[in-house]
């Protein structure tokens, strides 16, 4: 059994959000992502992996190109494999992230696809 203390894994940067992988298997990855207000991810997708975010603290906007939702501590969202998405922190925010799938690498896009 592996164990991680999430609170001790928190780390923030004024330049960009900090993402730390905590536990990894061949088909999954558990990580923590720490965001300062206003920090945003590129528009991207993970073609081979589902991505689940659980908001530990703070709040942010989660966008799939069709819907933008404000999530707060205690909320959870899932982006199925291949779904384009973007995350923006409204306040200092800590996310618990689980990726499930063999190919978890992100594919960045310059803009939202026309066929949203």
How does the language model describe each region?
Residues 1-28, 42, 73, 108-116:
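A short, N-terminal "cap"/entry segment at the start of jelly-roll beta-barrel domains
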Residues 31-46:
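Conserved short histidine dyad/triad with adjacent acidic residue
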Residues 40-42, 77, 81-86:
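Histidine-centered metal-chelating micro-motifs
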Residues 66-81:
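Short acidic-glycine-tyrosine-enriched beta hairpin
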Residues 81-105:
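Ligand-binding loop in jelly-roll beta-barrel domains
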């Amino acid at each position: 059994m592996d164990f991680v203390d999430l609170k001790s894994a928190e780390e923030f940067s004024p330049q960009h959000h900090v993402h730390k992988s905590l536990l990894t298997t061949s088909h999954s990855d558990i990580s923590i992502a720490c965001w300062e207000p206003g920090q945003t991810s590129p528009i991207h997708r993970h073609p081979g992996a589902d991505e689940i975010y659980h908001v530990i603290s703070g709040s942010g906007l989660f966008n799939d190109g069709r819907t933008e939702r404000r999530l707060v501590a205690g909320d959870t969202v899932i982006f199925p494999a291949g779904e384009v998405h973007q995350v923006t922190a409204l306040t200092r925010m800590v996310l618990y992230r689980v990726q499930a799938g063999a190919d978890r690498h992100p594919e960045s896009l310059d803009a939202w696809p026309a066929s949203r």
